[in-house]
Amino acid sequence: MAIHKVLGIETEYGIFVRNAPEQNPIAASSLLVNSYVSEVAQAGAGPRIGWDFGDEMPANDARGVLEQYVQPPDVETHLVNAVLTNGARFYVDHAHPEYSSPEVASARDGVVWDRAGEEVLRLAMTAANRTLGDDQQVIVHKNNSDGKANSYGTHENYVMDRAVPFNRIVARATPHLVTRQVFCGAGKVGCELPGRHDVTYQLSQRADFFEEEVGLETTLKRPIINTRDEPHADPQRYRRLHVIIGDANMSEWATWMKLATTAIVLAMIEDDWPMPELRPMTPVPTLRRISWDLSLAETYQTLDGRTITALETQRELCALARAWAAEHDTSVVGGVDAVTEVLGEWELVLDDLEHDRERAADRVDWVAKGRLLGGFAERHGLAPGSAKLRALDLQYHDLRRDRCLALRAGLRTLVSEAEVVSAIHSPPTDTRAWFRGTVLARFTDQVVTANWDSIVFDTGSSSLSRVPMMEPTRGTEAILGEMVASSADAAE
């Protein structure tokens, strides 16, 4: 039976320092994170609490084996790490600043705390730039590619029932992950694979960089289905599906639908809802061909021999989801009203993309960006894929408000600025993130380290105290609010 889809987003941001003698992204990222954490701590709005790496197990593979020649992901304990009072993690991952949102209980809340991450990065830029010379400036982009064949990720995480066979997840999640780019692709000028100069614009920023159908790695030989088995919860009950095949969306609607539709598909898989064979015969080439085809008419062959388009696949999945929702408890993915809204938006965007894609420009990033770029190219007589269009592509994702083209694209907003501002420092109330963020703010001097599934306190006794948080839906305000509010210190 499907379980509650607690979820979250990890975003690695692009970074560079304007007018720097040489680019050092690790140093720039460290400056960014440290500047934010120091400024927040000085303002009394948050502590300087480090990350507890004790439970990090990136080499654990859901298939139970580590294939020969596979390089397991590194745990970079030496780089800057901080836990924020909103329950998030803000740190340096390889050569990028990364914001990992707190666990949330709905796709809409996923949007709120993802947007809060954008504001954290904006505040961090301001803080970092105060330390630089007048001619230098840290600039951050919410995108997935530097245009020079280097990609950085936007990863999603979904709690799933451990009892579900992993091969069922692979078989039934792959079609959605390969084809959902038609409505949640962020758009990209050009192609970063050798010899594909004919691709001047495509749906997805990440499609060029995937090489495997299933695998453990996240930076090399990237797989459509990642097998990292690191649940950050009770490993006997839960698995965390780590989805690395997704774009960094500027559209709130696209972020919401990316999370909501995927959560529904995963709930269907947990319930073993009958699904036709939609898996591509060749998943990686299919992923790329779909991204490169702006007509959305590209077909692929399923494992059972059918020929189908990405839009048709999404229509089938949407119809299956509607049938599933009619017979199952939808509270695991937000409830009847939320699911009804998602299904309606799902059908509508597929209709718009098929019949008049311009109608989707207020929701779908690749359409919105393509319209901006197309208008600019026409006005200035630019060839497709020109350097100026590549620069505008980057500017779409620029977090500086006075430069960000996405803010001028007429994208639909789903959440209020007040919600986002609150979420910068406050955690969601209905997951364990509430306890993490609240005790960090309330008992700052007694928290030693924290991670997703535990917090270590120094209560003044002879040994440190570790409080496990192995249940993602516990540690909420409803369960612990009165106790925390009535406690004078962590020992109580």
Residue ranges and their predicted role:
Residues 126-129, 136-212:
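Internal, well-ordered domain-core segments that constitute the primary functional module
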Residues 1-136, 140-141, 171-186, 190, ...:
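Terminal catalytic/cofactor-binding subdomain
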